[in-house]
Regions:
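Conserved SAM-binding loop of SAM-dependent methyltransferases across substrates and taxa
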Residues: 48-61
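Conserved SAM-binding loop
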Residues: 77-78
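SAM/dcSAM-binding transferase cores
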Residues: 188-237
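A short acidic, Gly/Pro-enriched loop at the edge of an enzyme's catalytic core
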Residues: 100-108
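Conserved SAM-binding motif I beta-strand of class I
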Residues: 63-68
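Mobile active-site "lid"/loop adjacent to the S-adenosyl-L-methionine
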Residues: 112-139, 143
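Conserved Class I SAM-dependent methyltransferase catalytic core
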Residues: 19-22, 136-192
Length: 237
C-alpha cells in the first residue's frame, strides 16, 4: 500500500494517504485533551493515528489506543508505530460499539466526521466509514462512559452547529460537559468554525467557557497560541 509521511514537531513520522490524512482540528483536539505522561488514552475513529502519534511526539508514554473501523487506517497507524518505535501505541481495527477491553481509560478523544446527512459522494465512498451515519455523538458518549475511569474525560471537536447534540449525548450518558472552547480562524470572524468540548464521567454540574482560540494572527500567520500548541511538550506528572 502506498503512503507518504508527514513529520511532526519533534520528529515523529505519520504515514498518510489520500483517504487517511489530518488537519488542524486533530492538532487542536490532541492538545485540548491534556493527556498526561503515563495516562491511558483512547482515540476513537483514529484514522491514520494522528492524535496518539501527536501525544507520542510530545512525550506521552502511557497506554494509547488508536481505534479505527477501517483496516487501511489501522495499517497506516501500525506503519507509523514501527517507523517511530512507538511501542506504547496500539492500533486496533474495530467498531467502538462492539469493542471490549479491560482497560479503564483516563482520557477518550474523538474527532468525528463533519457531514451528517445525505449519501456520500462517489469520491467519498472510500471514506464512508467516517460518515456520521456509522457513528453518532450518542454512540461515542455511550462508549466513552463504558471505557472511562470515574471522572475520566471525553474530549471531542465538532462543528458549532452540532454543539447541542454533543452536550445532549454526553448528558444522556452521564458525562457532564465541563469545558467548551470555540475556535475562530481570525479574531474578526463572526462565526467560529470548530468547538472543543471536555466532559467528565459522573462529573459535577459546572461549565467553563474558555476564550475563543484564534488560529491566525493579523498578518495571516499562526497566532502565538497556535504556535505554542504545535510545540508544547506533555507535562511529565
Amino acid at each position: 500500500m502506498e503512503y507518504t509521511t508527514e513529520l511532526l514537531a519533534h520528529g515523529t513520522k505519520v504515514c498518510i494517504n489520500k483517504t487517511h490524512r489530518f488537519g488542524t482540528d486533530a492538532f487542536l483536539l490532541s492538545h485540548f485533551a491534556g493527556v498526561k505522561y503515563r495516562q491511558a488514552a483512547l482515540d476513537i475513529g483514529s484514522g491514520c493515528g494522528i492524535i496518539p502519534l501527536r501525544w507520542y511526539d510530545f512525550g506521552h508514554r502511557g497506554n494509547a489506543v488508536a481505534l479505527e473501523i477501517d483496516a487501511e487506517g489501522t495499517w497506516l497507524t501500525n506503519e507509523s508505530i514501527k517507523l517511530n518505535g512507538a511501542e506504547n501505541i496500539t492500533a486496533v481495527n474495530a467498531d467502538i460499539r462492539d469493542w471490549k477491553t479491560d482497560i479503564q481509560f483516563d482520557v477518550v478523544t474523538c474527532n468525528p466526521p463533519y457531514f451528517t446527512r445525505g449519501k456520500p459522494k462517489d469520491d467519498e465512498k472510500k471514506a464512508s466509514f467516517r460518515h456520521q451515519f456509522t457513528l453518532t455523538d450518542f454512540d461515542v458518549a455511550k462508549a466513552a462512559f463504558r471505557l472511562l475511569k470515574d471522572n475520566g474525560k471525553l474530549c471531542v471537536c465538532q462543528r458549532p452547529s452540532r454543539l447541542a447534540t454533543v452536550i445532549y449525548a454526553m448528558k444522556q450518558n452521564r458525562i457532564e460537559p465541563k469545558v467548551i472552547r470555540f475556535v475562530k480562524q481570525r479574531t474578526h470572524d463572526d462565526v467560529p468554525w470548530l468547538v472543543l468540548v471536555d466532559g467528565r464521567k459522573n462529573g459535577g454540574a459546572s461549565l467553563t467557557v474558555m476564550p475563543d482560540l484564534i488560529v491566525e494572527n493579523v498578518n495571516g500567520g499562526f497566532s502565538d497560541e497556535i504556535l505554542s500548541i504545535y510545540g508544547k511538550n506533555i507535562n511529565k506528572e
